[in-house]
Every structure is written in structure tokens, then in C-alpha cells.
């Protein structure tokens, strides 16, 4: 038999279509430098090579960045590490989630695989709950010029890595911010994105969410333009900050709680037509105001998360939803965070009982009623705390009394959570009447 332990798995398909701990706020941010061939060989990267190359760094506040050589955008490509983009996102993260926290960062070449994610989770002892991936790899590909839509491969690759980590009891939610401005092809990359060809990213990938959009301001435009790859700066830092500050059951798109106007005075997509015009500026980065409701609804229906505005809220910028690339039970980041929290807590509570004696009923050979009650109480106590803190609506714990633990040395415990709902849509019917009755 394999090595003993407590092994967790979850089920999908059961539903259809705020207490906090330090661990649920632990966050990771991976910068994929595979498109920066000389990142650690020249300029700012060379200056910090010994500190950053191959290392996972824990940052607890903005004060830690100076020593690491991570500085704000200045316009000097010799001094700005990755064009100031890392500082921009880390600053957003701590600005939103609080001045102190736990953020693990890494700069790694992920052109061949995403093993850096596993390395980061190991360095954090499995405690990273949400991980942002900023990459210059193209989000969309055009393998067939005659195809009606682009293809999307990054989501599948990241889902596979996250699923593997979940099997190792280190589950996390991945937020992907990739190069949406340049379409990868078999030959020369295409710098013009056709909105009608954007594919759905809902491909049964519950651990991954795809982010689009960025701030519309001079520094963001300058950072994108300074990068030869023209990769959008994105909004990954703000998204991670919102998630880290939210309770596990809360959507980071909650309008009343996560207004980002202080970080994004105006917004754009960051893609469209990034060929240079006669003024050496990007031709079009699709201002949010230039997109109509049909186009925005289409992006939402295809599973993307983007910065948005609501009519009537003049001073407001928000994330559109907290959806994942799945339409199953775990179709939101909040639901994944909730089940991940329960998994970690239940597993930690049960680990002391691995290889412990299990008293059986001598008349049946099955698990004794006392032991069944004991294990039910262990799990129920944890889930009751979550319910009292309104992180879940309810739960059930089941232990089959007819388990033959003498035969297989295995105890099977099942629990189900009733999640907290979310008001993604509020529909109101209005009209006139002759009376108020």
C-alpha cells in the first residue's frame, strides 16, 4: 500500500448551473520572462540577478522592494525592471489589501512549462491561495487562418498544473494576465485583434480565471509602448489585492466593496491594433467607452473578467465578475476559495489521527458509533465555524457506518458545503398602477 495520510478530493455537479486566517490571504505573483531573452543579462535585470534569478521571494510590504531593485516606472529602460510593471502591480496589491501582507514573487522563464508555479507553492509551504500569472505569451493563437475563432492554450496548461497541486493538498486559484494584444501564428505575429474571433475560455478549467483590461493613463501607455513585445500592463495586482482582502465567500467584483477608481481613473482593454502609427503611438488599445453593451456581454459570456463601469456610478471602476473558466459548481473564484479553505482546515484537523487506532463494533466488525461521532464532530466543528462566519450557508458530514476498516485500513469521510450565493444580476420589474395595492 501507499504511504498513509489524509487525502482530500472534491466533487462537482452537485448544484447545477467571514472569518479570515493568515493563510487564505497568502498570495503569489509570477512574472514569466520567457519573451525577455536577456532579462538577467543586461540593464536592471543584471543588477538584481543574484537576488531574483531562480528564487522565490516573500514580500511583506512596499519597503521590501527597494532592496530588490524593483522600482516604479521612470522611462529609463536601463533602470526600470521589466519596464516598471512589477512595481506597478505590487503597489496595487498592497494598496488594496493593506500595507502589510504575504506576497511571494518570482521571475522565471515559463516558455517550456509552468513548473515555476509548483516551485512557488513549495517555497510557501503550500499556503499560496491565489496566484497571479503575468506573462508575455500570447493569450490567443491563430493556427488556422480560416478558423472562425482564435484558439486558447494557456488556460489548459495552467489548469493542469493547478489540478496537480490540488491533488497534493496545495490548492490555489490562478489569475492569468497574458499578452492579449498580439495573436500568435505559425509565421509572423498579428498585432490586430478581431473581437469576433475571441474564443470562449470556459473550458472546464475551474482553477483558472482570465483577466483583460488595464488602466488608461500616461504611465500605463508608456510602459506598454516601452516593451518591444507590446504586452498590456494589465490589472493583475489590483485583482490579487481585492481577492486577498475579501473573505473567501466574497466576490472581488462586489460593487459596494471594491471600487477601484483610485487605481484606474479610466480604463481600456490594452489590445485592438497595437501597430505603431505615424506618431509612434499604438494605433488602438480599445478604450472601454468605445465598446458597446453587446461586445461587453459577449466577453463576459465567454468567461473573461475585465475592468468595467456601471451607468449611473460616475466615479466607479470595478471588476466585471469573479468567474472561472468553468461553468460547473466551481464557476467562481469565491467558491473555489471557500472549498480550498475548508479542505486545508479539515485536513489539518484530521492529520493527527493518521495511523491512530479505530475501535470497531465487535458484533459487526464495522466502525464503532463512538468513533463515527468523534470524526463527525471534528469536521463539523470546522464547518460550523465557517457557517457562523457566513462563509458558507450550511453543510453536511457523512460517515458510512458500514465501513470495513479492519479489511482496508481506510476511513472515508464525506462532507458537502452549501455555498453563499452571489447577486451577479438583479432584475427588477417596474410599472405604473392606479393604486398601491
Task: Spell out what each predicted region is.
Residues 1-206:
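Small-residue-rich
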Residues 21-22, 211-216, 402-409:
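Short, ordered beta-strand-loop transition motifs
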Residues 170-253, 258-264:
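Long, hydrophobic alpha/beta structural blocks
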Residues 360, 364-416:
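C-terminal structured domain segments
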Residues 85-86, 338, 375, 411:
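Alpha-helical structural motif
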Residues 103, 108, 392-437:
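Compositionally biased, low-complexity/repeat regions
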